[in-house]
Amino acid sequence: MQTVGREARAASRTLAAASTDAKNSALVAMAQAIRDSRDALLAANAADLAEARAAGLDEALIDRLTLSAKGVEGMAAGLEQVAALPDPVGEITDVKRRPSGIQVGKMRVPLGVVGIIYEARPNVTADAAALCLKSGNAAILRGGKEALRSNQAIASCVRTGLAAAGLPQTAVQVLETTDRAAVGALITMPEFVDVIVPRGGKGLIERISSEARVPVIKHLDGNCHVYVDDHADPAKVLPIVENAKTQRYGTCNTTESLLVARAVAPRFLSDIGRMLAARNVEMRACPEALALLREAGIEGARLSPATEQDWHEEYLAPIIAIRVVAGLDEAIAHINTYSSGHTEAILTEHYTHAMRFLREVDSASVMVNASTRFADGFEYGLGAEIGISTDKIHARGPVGLEGLTSQKWIVFGNGEIRR
């Protein structure tokens, strides 16, 4: 690992000085290599999936592991989109002339070497390579053993792109070992690694956060909420709740808790409950919601009383917690008590309610009349994301190019001395 770190540090200095054209050329070449290697990528992924199923891994993990032809094209398109984004490196802002005569400003610069530790998402290999490269950072990637073949195949495409642009292939290194000791080494090399981005289960992220000797950009889980306000538009409620909960169960921006204002709960919960039941979603409801759902004819295994733990839970499964609240005040209080700080949405046509929700809900992404599934770097126009942060220092929410840079102070003088 010392050799890997040393090579990454050397490559980071080359990348920090690399031109935008060189970085973009590498990204475009990576995208073409991925398209040219589609069959090989899908074959590698199929082998990973077969092994994962044979090992009895859960469906949420298998969902994250799966690559399709559409997914391969999405990776290539993501690389090209990052190439098309403005290069943040070298950007100078906030230049002001001081009374002394000097001009003081800020310049955006790369972080240096970024270590990314992730589990079952092979697309992270391409996304991380793209964002680190464009932002002038070297990357050390350590994927999960369940995606080893997929990650190796994608890494080959990344190296092809770097070589085509004349950039060091050590700028993006994918660790091919499945030894857990590699993670311990990666997160304790501050002389070579400037920041760690873990993407995976809560246990992995908690371990890295407690053991790392370098800064960590992270979120522990995604207990996302949708609140149906008493001024919600009926035409928007069902489609948004359906999308937010049922589009994909294994993602951190999937809604796990539904709050409904008491004044409109009888109106909306029957239709919402029937929709969720038709999609085999288990509902864990407060007593008031439980009664309304039973009145709508929902019984059996799909409906049960919620416990205190349910309000904290990131299910990553076809399960949702449902609570009737008095109104906006109780909804905000509930979210700020139980949320993981990831993403929350209010469905309302009331401007004041919407603005209060945006101001007072303490999460990385807060939405009005939109699905929580939009909390994603690609959807936010970042091209791709290195991860999502629920911390408040440095980067918050989806972390794209700008989140992988820092700023340094720059001073322009003309012979001034301090008096």
UniProtKB/Swiss-Prot annotation:
The pathway this protein participates in, as annotated, is: Amino-acid biosynthesis; L-proline biosynthesis; L-glutamate 5-semialdehyde from L-glutamate: step 2/2
> Which Pfam family name is an example for this entry?
Aldedh
Q: Does the keyword Amino-acid biosynthesis apply?
A: yes
Task: Name the Gene Ontology molecular function terms of this record.
Answer: glutamate-5-semialdehyde dehydrogenase activity; NADP binding
Matching Gene3D superfamilies, A to Z?
Answer: Aldehyde Dehydrogenase, Chain A, domain 1 (3.40.605.10), Aldehyde Dehydrogenase, Chain A, domain 2 (3.40.309.10)
UniProt keywords (A-Z) are: Amino-acid biosynthesis, Cytoplasm, NADP, Oxidoreductase, Proline biosynthesis
PROSITE patterns according to UniProt: PROA
Q: Which GO terms describe its cellular component?
A: cytoplasm
Give the reaction(s) catalysed. L-glutamate 5-semialdehyde + phosphate + NADP(+) = L-glutamyl 5-phosphate + NADPH + H(+)
Report the record's Gene Ontology biological process terms.
L-proline biosynthetic process
**Top-rank taxon:** Bacteria
Location in or out of the cell: Cytoplasm
Q: What's its EC?
A: 1.2.1.41
Its function, per the record, reads:
Catalyzes the NADPH-dependent reduction of L-glutamate 5-phosphate into L-glutamate 5-semialdehyde and phosphate. The product spontaneously undergoes cyclization to form 1-pyrroline-5-carboxylate.
Q: Which HAMAP family match?
A: ProA
Protein family (similarity comment): Belongs to the gamma-glutamyl phosphate reductase family.
Q: What is this protein called?
A: Gamma-glutamyl phosphate reductase
Q: Which organism is it from?
A: Azoarcus sp. (strain BH72)
> Gene encoding this chain?
proA
